[in-house]
């Protein structure tokens, strides 16, 4: 277990049995990221990695994520068997050949499956890393349910707000960065001088939209009473 460039999460590569995944592919053709749930109770990314490495089951996913780490079982340059219809009809043009599958480990409480907050946060890290790596927009991050109607990940089909929350987290940092960049473009803070009652003071001079401003805190430092 270690770290991989750009991914702030413990990472392991555990190659799945060759019978569980398909042909090689050009990663330039990757257009979607499909999120799934394992449908197990208390499983781990390591356990799933070992399972798909040691058993022939004819299915797979590229990544498995749990509370504290992720395991990659199929190389991005290979086709994983993770989002076929199993008799259902396709609802979009996402296929195994043009997507990456990310499985989230689950727990079961009183017969109901849940994806823990920590697992969700780690899945966000993995998905955002893949989005950046392959230039995939948030609109192309979908559930298995969106591919063919399968109830997967079931907790996020049952509760659409959970899915909406996940999607919002994928673009949150990008939006914050954009706002910050916009602010930096329109607002510049430099050190200046002001003379008040014949005395010179150092001030923070703010140039914004072509106008000069002084931070109110500067007046307080000069000994004036300042109210907000």
Identify the meaning behind each predicted range:
Residues 39, 67, 77, 106, ...:
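A mature extracytoplasmic/lumenal domain signature
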Residues 1-95:
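N-terminal catalytic cores of peptidoglycan-degrading enzymes
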Residues 72-73, 149, 202, 214:
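A sequence-level detector of short linear motifs
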Residues 37-41, 74, 130-134, 174, ...:
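Sec/Tat-exported extracytoplasmic proteins
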Residues 175-228:
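Primary recognition of N-terminal secretory signal peptides and signal-anchoring hydrophobic helices
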């Amino acid at each position: 277990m270690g770290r991989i460039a750009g991914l702030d999460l413990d990472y392991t590569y555990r190659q799945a049995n060759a019978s569980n995944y398909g042909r090689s592919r050009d990663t330039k053709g990757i257009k979607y990221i499909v999120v799934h749930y394992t449908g197990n109770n208390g499983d781990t990314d390591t356990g799933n990695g070992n399972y798909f490495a040691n058993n022939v089951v004819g299915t797979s996913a590229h990544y498995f994520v749990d509370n504290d780490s992720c395991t990659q079982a199929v190389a991005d340059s290979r086709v994983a068997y993770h989002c076929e219809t199993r008799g259902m009809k396709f609802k979009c043009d996402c296929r195994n050949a043009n997507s990456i599958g990310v499985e989230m480990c689950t727990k079961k409480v009183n017969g109901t499956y849940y994806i823990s907050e920590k697992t969700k946060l780690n899945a966000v890290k993995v998905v955002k890393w893949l989005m950046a790596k392959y230039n995939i927009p948030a609109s192309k991050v979908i559930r298995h349910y969106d591919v063919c109607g399968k109830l997967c990940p079931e907790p996020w089909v049952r509760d659409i707000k959970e899915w909406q929350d996940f999607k919002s987290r994928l673009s949150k940092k990008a939006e914050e960065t954009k706002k910050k960049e916009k602010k930096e473009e329109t607002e510049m803070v430099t050190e200046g001088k002001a003379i008040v009652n014949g005395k010179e003071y150092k001030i923070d001079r703010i140039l914004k939209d072509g106008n000069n401003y002084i931070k109110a805190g500067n007046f307080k430092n000069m000994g004036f009473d300042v109210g907000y």
